[in-house]
Amino acid sequence: MVKPKIALIGGGQIGNSIAHLAAMRELGNVIMFDIKDGLAQGKCLDIAQAAPISNFDVQLCGSNDISCIAGADIVVVTAGIPRKPGMTREDLIEINARIMVTVAEGIKTHAPESIVIVLSNPLDAMVTLCQKITGFPTQRIMGMAGVLDSARFASFIAWELGVSVRDVNAMVLGGHGDAMVPIVRFANVNGIPALELLKNKYGDEDKARQVMAGLVERTQDAGGEVVHLLQTGSAFISPATSAIAMVEAVIHDQKRLLPVCAMLDGQFGISGYYVGVPCILGVGGVERIVEFELTEDEQALLDHSVGEVKKLVDSLPL
C-alpha cells in the first residue's frame, strides 16, 4: 500500500514538530521544504534517526527545491516569520504575504491536486492569499486556527475547574486574532455547562460569569502570552498538534467536526471570506460547513471578528 505523501513548507519549529508528529503516528511519508540550505535536510535526518527507538517506519526527506512537493496528498504551510514580543499577528502581513505568494505559486505548479492547510500568520489573510494564487477549489484550501484556539479555551476551563482536559469540550469561532469568539454556552465538561460548574464552584452567578470572561480574554491573548514568555518566538507544539489533527482527519477520512478557517458562502450571514467555523473534515478536505443559530450577542461578536478579517484581507496584494 502506497503511503500518503505529506509535504511541509517551512522548516521552523512548527514544521519540525509537525514532521515529528506525522512520523510518530505513521500518517505518511514526509517531505520538508525550506529555503535555508540544509535546514530541512538536517531536521528530517534528525527525526528519521529516532525511528528505531520510537518504532515508526516512514520516509522523511528534506529539500531546498520546492519541486520536492510534487505528488503530495496534503501540503501544510508554516512558512513565514513568527511573532516576537510586542507584535500582533497582523504586524506580520507584509513580509509573510510576499512569502505566501511564492509558496502558493509553487504549490499550484507542483502539487495541483493537493489539499492545503495553512498555518502562517496572519492566518485568515494568508489562507485567503493562498487560495487566490493557487485557484484551488475552496474546499481544498483551509486554515488551522480554531482547533488550536478551542484547545486553549478548553485547557483554561479545565485548569480553572480542576477537571481533566479530556472531558472539556469548547469551540472558538471567527478570525485568528484578538477578536476571536469563544462560544461560552457550548463550553461543557462531559455535557455539563462550564458556567454551571463555575457557579457550583463559586456559589455566585455573577462571579462565575466574571471568571468565564477572564478565561475568554485569556484565550483571545493565548498566543501572545506564549510569545511574551518565550521572548524569542511563538508557540509551536500546540499549533503543530492542532495541524496534525486536521491532517489525520483528511488522510483517514475521519469526518471529524472541527473548527476550521474555511471559505463561507452565506453561512452565518457571511460570504466571500475565510473565517473559523465548524466543519466536517474528510478525504475531500472541507466536506461540509456546519451552521447553527447564534444568539444576537454571539452574532455581533462574530460580525466584529469578521470585520477585522476583512480589514486584513482588503490590504492584501490580490
From Swiss-Prot:
What residues does substrate bind to?
Answer: 83, 89, 121, 152
User: Which EC class, in a word?
Assistant: oxidoreductase
Indicate whether NAD appears among the record's keywords.
Answer: yes
Q: What GO molecular function annotation could you give as one example from this UniProt entry?
A: L-lactate dehydrogenase activity
Q: Where does NAD(+) bind?
A: 10-15, 34, 96, 119-121
UniProt keyword annotation of Oxidoreductase present = yes
User: Which residue ranges traverse the bilayer?
Assistant: none
Q: Which reaction does it catalyse?
A: (S)-malate + NAD(+) = oxaloacetate + NADH + H(+)
Q: Which UniProt keywords apply?
A: NAD, Oxidoreductase, Tricarboxylic acid cycle
Q: Could you say which EC number(s) this protein's record lists?
A: 1.1.1.37
Q: Where is the active site?
A: 176
Gene3D superfamilies attached to this UniProt entry: Lactate dehydrogenase/glycoside hydrolase, family 4, C-terminal, NAD(P)-binding Rossmann-like Domain
Give a Pfam family name: Ldh_1_N
The record's Gene Ontology biological-process terms are: lactate metabolic process; tricarboxylic acid cycle
> What InterPro entries does the annotation carry?
L-lactate/malate_DH, Lactate/malate_DH_C, Lactate/malate_DH_N, Lactate_DH/Glyco_Ohase_4_C, Malate_DH_type3, NAD(P)-bd_dom_sf
Q: Which HAMAP family match?
A: Malate_dehydrog_3 (MF_00487)
User: Which family, according to the similarity comment?
Assistant: Belongs to the LDH/MDH superfamily. MDH type 3 family.
Record's function text: Catalyzes the reversible oxidation of malate to oxaloacetate.
Name of the featured protein: Malate dehydrogenase
| Native source organism of the sequence | Syntrophotalea carbinolica (strain DSM 2380 / NBRC 103641 / GraBd1)
Q: What is the lineage of its organism?
A: Bacteria, Pseudomonadati, Thermodesulfobacteriota, Desulfuromonadia, Desulfuromonadales
Q: What's the encoding gene here?
A: mdh
